[in-house]
Curated annotation (Swiss-Prot):
Lineage: Bacteria, Bacillati, Bacillota, Bacilli, Bacillales
Protein species of origin: Exiguobacterium sp. (strain ATCC BAA-1283 / AT1b)
Protein family (similarity comment): Belongs to the purine/pyrimidine phosphoribosyltransferase family.
GO molecular function, one term: adenine binding
EC number assigned by the record: 2.4.2.7
Primary location recorded for the protein, binned into one broad class: cytoplasm
SUPFAM superfamilies named in the record: PRTase-like (SSF53271)
Role: Catalyzes a salvage reaction resulting in the formation of AMP, that is energically less costly than de novo synthesis.
GO-annotated biological processes: adenine salvage; AMP salvage; purine ribonucleoside salvage
Entry-linked PROSITE patterns: PUR_PYR_PR_TRANSFER
Reaction catalyzed: AMP + diphosphate = 5-phospho-alpha-D-ribose 1-diphosphate + adenine
GO cellular component assignments: cytoplasm
Protein name: Adenine phosphoribosyltransferase
UniProt keywords, alphabetically: Cytoplasm, Glycosyltransferase, Purine salvage, Transferase
InterPro entries given in the database record: Ade_phspho_trans, PRibTrfase_dom, PRTase-like, UPRTase/APRTase
Length: 172
């Protein structure tokens, strides 16, 4: 299926010069949304996933249904202050400053095979922070899957050494 035809591009959003790739148009079509999640499920299964992790908020949009389909647990990766129990945390760089991501300390067991799912790979900063926490807890990153990858922003290069899968790729 050509998933790209179901992504709407919004010019100059969220700021001038940006061509925003809007996944909500894909999600509004139940058949297409299901097929996109099914592709990520197949990828996670191939990679031997024992657990799915996804960064907020759009990682939940693909990660939760994939975990459900695979009958696996889902680990939410959240911004600081959003999880109620003891967490691990990683600071990561943004275009203008830094942010902190967290996950529960008891969410991953040593040696557990974790597949990370998210909506979009751009620079890879959020996923790199997610990887650090998974590995800090002793988990193994078995693969990383995305609906969309924006080539030319260094994300794939930043994740070198990990298996990366994308349903849709946009060149520069």
């Amino acid at each position: 299926m050509d998933f790209k035809q179901h992504i709407k591009e919004v010019a100059d959003y969220p700021k001038e010069g940006i061509s925003f790739k809007d996944i909500t148009s894909l999600m509004q079509n139940g058949e297409v949304y299901k097929k996109s999640v099914d592709e990520l499920v197949a990828y996670a299964r191939e990679r031997g996933a024992e657990l799915i992790a996804g960064p907020e908020a759009r990682g939940f949009v693909v990660g939760c249904p994939a975990a459900y389909a695979l009958e696996l647990g889902f680990v939410p990766v959240r911004k600081e202050g959003k999880l109620p129990r003891e967490t691990v945390r990683v600071s990561y760089g943004l275009e203008y400053g830094t942010d902190i991501l967290t996950m529960h300390k008891d969410s991953i067991q040593p040696g557990q095979q974790v597949v990370i799912l998210d909506d979009l790979l751009a620079t890879g900063g959020t996923i790199e922070a997610t990887i650090k926490m998974i590995e800090q807890l002793g988990g193994v990153v078995a693969g990383i899957g995305f609906l969309i990858e924006l080539d030319g922003l260094g994300g794939r290069e930043r994740l070198e050494g990990y298996d990366v899968f994308s349903l849709i790729r946009y060149e520069d």
